[in-house]
Amino acid sequence: MRRTIEEELALNGHSFFQTVGDSMEPLLHNRESTVVIEAKRAPLKRYDVALYRRPATGAYVLHRVVKVLDDAYLICGDNRIWRETVPNEWVIGVMTGYYEKEQDKYISCESAPYQSY
């Protein structure tokens, strides 16, 4: 039986999965990008890419923090115009890098190419 992302993060401290959807294009591509997520251990910063789960639907969402609020984050997909207020407790992880299928190489969120994005 496959583990949930939360179980993977609790067990290993990180998880890998392929993205689905176009909300983070042009950075991440539908079914072509594989992201590396680490368990959230500290408050997120502006421009971090947060993984959160919407309690009403159980859907996982990977979007960028555009503003840090007191007990929440204002979050938006790179390819979206609407923003969502996400309570701190919904956030389960943060993207630390990704693999692009075409390039077949790892790009860290700390690297110059990512930082210039």
Positions of PLM-derived features:
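Extended hydrophobic leader/signal-anchor segments used for secretion and membrane insertion
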Residues: M1-Y117
